């Protein structure tokens, strides 16, 4: 008859291996986890904010609110880019810059964009991420367990009150990388979103914020007016009609794209307009 102690040892080993292989945690998810996942997957971010506000205050709730606030900041940026008619062409050299690589639905009637409006979009993103970071800082004081599949998160980028597969993070990732997502159960990007993940997200926000502060410290109006038609071709920019030629998706680097990129680089002798932002970066 097997030794009882060996049986218990084998049972413990089997349980440990099963947990490791399954990629799940025995820890119970926070009460905020269901509300967070439900609304992120549905793209109903305002509803998620209301649902989380109704829960008791604890570290899990604050972390969930911070995650939701960060995703909302990305949605608001995407809505602003769509409103002004951002067009991303995979073959364009000017499409390699951060923020402007974000694919948004086509807008047949974009609002005009100016240098001041562009700075306003970046300043709003900076403020929204700071608010998200403040919530995450509160959440990081305790533990959290907020399982999420990032590829299922949906955004309403064109402000039509609906979401599509192209507006999911999975769809956005596929468009940016130009690689289709795996089919079936392989198409997952699951995170436990525990305290370590919350701290990582705070670090990522700080990195993005530093880059934004550095850019906003500069006066880059001449560069914007001369080259931003590469991103916003139908938004009333000065040289759009004279310089822009249609670029078919996947057509490689068009002549106008190379010219815009060279002009952008050669005009980067920007003056510091707001020195205080450099110390904040």
Annotated model-derived regions:
Residues 63-65:
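Alpha-solenoid helical repeat scaffolds
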Residues 58-61:
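Residue-level recognition of tetratricopeptide repeat
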Residues 14-25:
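Bacterial N-terminal signal peptides
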Residues 31, 35, 39-47, 70-281:
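Short coil/linker segments at helix-helix boundaries
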Residues 1-8:
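Short, Lys/Arg-enriched N-terminal segments with co-localized hydrophobic residues
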């Amino acid at each position: 008859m097997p030794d009882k102690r060996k049986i218990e040892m084998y049972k413990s080993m089997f349980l440990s291996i099963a947990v490791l292989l399954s990629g799940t945690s025995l820890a119970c998810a926070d009460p905020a986890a269901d509300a967070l996942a439900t609304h992120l997957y549905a793209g109903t971010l305002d509803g998620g904010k209301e649902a989380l506000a109704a829960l008791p205050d604890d570290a899990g709730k604050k972390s969930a609110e911070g995650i939701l606030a960060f995703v909302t900041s990305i949605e608001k940026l995407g809505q602003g880019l769509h409103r002004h008619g951002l067009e991303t062409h995979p073959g364009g050299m000017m499409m390699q810059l951060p923020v402007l690589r974000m694919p948004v639905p086509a807008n047949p009637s974009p609002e005009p964009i100016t240098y001041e409006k562009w700075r306003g979009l970046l300043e709003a993103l900076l403020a929204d991420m700071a608010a998200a970071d403040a919530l995450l800082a509160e959440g990081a004081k305790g533990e959290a367990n907020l399982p999420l599949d990032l590829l299922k998160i949906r955004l309403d980028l064109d402000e039509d009150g609906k979401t599509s597969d192209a507006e999911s993070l999975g769809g956005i990732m596929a468009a940016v990388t130009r690689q289709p997502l795996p089919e079936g159960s392989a198409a997952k990007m699951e995170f436990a979103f525990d305290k370590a993940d919350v701290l990582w997200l705070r670090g990522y926000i700080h990195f993005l914020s530093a880059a934004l502060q550095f850019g906003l410290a500069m006066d880059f109006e001449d560069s914007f007016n001369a080259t931003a038609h590469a991103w916003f071709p139908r938004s009333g920019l000065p040289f759009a009609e004279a310089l822009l030629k249609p670029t078919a998706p996947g057509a490689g680097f068009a002549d106008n794209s190379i010219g815009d990129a060279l002009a952008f680089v050669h005009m980067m002798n920007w003056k510091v307009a707001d020195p205080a932002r450099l110390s904040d970066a």
